[in-house]
Amino acid sequence: MHGAQIDISITAQLAEITRVADCVESFGRNQRVPSHAVNDMNVVLDEIISNIVRYGGESARAHPIEIRLGRTGDRFSAEVRDRGIPFDPVAHVIPPPRPDRQKTPGNLGILFVRALMDEVRYKRENETNVLLVAKTAAGLGTLEVPPFGIETTRPDAQSALVALRGVLVGTTHTKLREQLRTLIDSGVVNIIVDLAETARIASSGFLVLFRTRRRLDELGGRLVLCNPQPVVRTLFEISGLLGEFTFAPDRDAALQALRKPLDPLPA
């Protein structure tokens, strides 16, 4: 069966993730790929490209990353080729999660790749990493992702409400990180992050939230997340971090959660 495909060539830079995401969304719209499959593919490609840029070495940065998107029937796929050091995410052994809530989690990207895709295959060919990821995408659909934005309000001197819009990924997480740092430096110790308009979160975004929660713990404050969309909540479940955060169904409940006495941190 013949299908549709497009080829994308990018330099090994994190800034290119935005262009890839735009191509995936455009291809998805043209091919009527269901929105959940487009979202999952963009999370996975964010993780793959970020890993190549950060850990692929000089050989990866000296050559383009080649991506082929395709849809054949219900199969939505991406093949990624890079010249970085060999790395097989299929064979990589992920250690068990650490029970210490203050330690930064690792291997989130590999977890997302394995969990979100129905097929993950790797081979090394002519000094090139070739990674194929594919997802069954039955049916038709469209996806509209709002542009990234952060809106902040201050209920009181020590609290802030941060509403996120769009995607929290490799190219946008630094904006949230700097905004949260600025709030904490100004004396804020309680932060609500509203995820109602957040379409997806990659591992870089999870780490910003985790480190913020850890910092607020140290200050005797609290981070509360509210209104997560089902796809975002699923990513928290996959990451194993669902129990590391306080969740609320809406802003009012989040404000009430901030007023509850804090449990003492384990010694």
Where are these regions (language model features)?
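Conserved beta-strand-loop-beta-strand hairpin that lines the nucleotide-binding pocket
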Residues: 1-7, 52-144, 238, 245
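Helix-loop-beta hinge of the Bergerat
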Residues: 3-35, 180
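STAS-typified acidic loop motif
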Residues: 7-19, 147-178, 195-199
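Conserved short strand/loop->alpha-helix "switch" segment adjacent to the catalytic nucleotide/phosphoryl-transfer site
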Residues: 22-46, 101-105
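Conserved catalytic core of two-component sensor histidine kinases
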Residues: 38, 42, 114, 177, ...
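Amphipathic alpha-helical interaction surfaces in cytosolic regulatory modules
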Residues: 49, 83, 167-245
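Conserved beta-strand core positions
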Residues: 63-65, 76, 131, 148, ...
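A charged, well-structured terminal subsegment
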Residues: 247-267
